[in-house]
Amino acid sequence: MAKIGLFYGTQTGVTQTIAESIQQEFGGESIVDLNDIANADASDLNAYDYLIIGCPTWNVGELQSDWEGIYDDLDSVNFQGKKVAYFGAGDQVGYSDNFQDAMGILEEKISSLGSQTVGYWPIEGYDFNESKAVRNNQFVGLAIDEDNQPDLTKNRIKTWVSQLKSEFGL
């Protein structure tokens, strides 16, 4: 099976925990390389044909600081032919008007650079007003809400990883 590069940013550790769960659901570190974007360069994304990008929405609809720091550097990455999946951590109750915005901001940027987005996720089961991560009535990736729906996280990850295995062609 091809190596998958999972790049995540985290402020409080929630996104890292989700990333580790995704890695384990895929079968461990022999399949998925975990990369904290705080310790990586944008050019590190070039090493993989399959990418998973994880980012919490921070403050009011903003990118997590480490993703914000390399956002412009993403222009130098060759995303042509890469399949990219996204996951986000957010609070649909406290931040209903910008739930998962960071995931949408990153997907919009990276897809504009030639990648193919995979891993779309249904909006059913969530209660929010607005999100930059919704396209055609679906999230652009897996939406996790550990603040309000922690009991759903494990099953959502399991279902999404199964979907990704198929969409990545693995």
Curated annotation (Swiss-Prot):
InterPro entries: Flavodoxin, Flavodoxin/NO_synth, Flavodoxin_CS, Flavodoxin_lc, Flavoprotein-like_sf
Bilayer-crossing regions: none
Limits of the Flavodoxin-like domain: 4-165
Gene3D superfamilies: 3.40.50.360
GO molecular function, one term: FMN binding
Inducing factors: By iron stress.
Tree of life domain: Bacteria
Keyword tags: Electron transport, Flavoprotein, FMN, Stress response, Transport
Any one Pfam family match given in the protein's UniProt record, by short name: Flavodoxin_1
Family to which this protein belongs: Belongs to the flavodoxin family.
PANTHER family reported in the protein's UniProt record: FLAVODOXIN 1, FLAVODOXIN 2
Function: Low-potential electron donor to a number of redox enzymes.
Family annotation (NCBIfam families): flav_long, PRK09267.1-2, PRK09267.1-4, PRK09267.1-5
Protein name: Flavodoxin
Record gene name: isiB
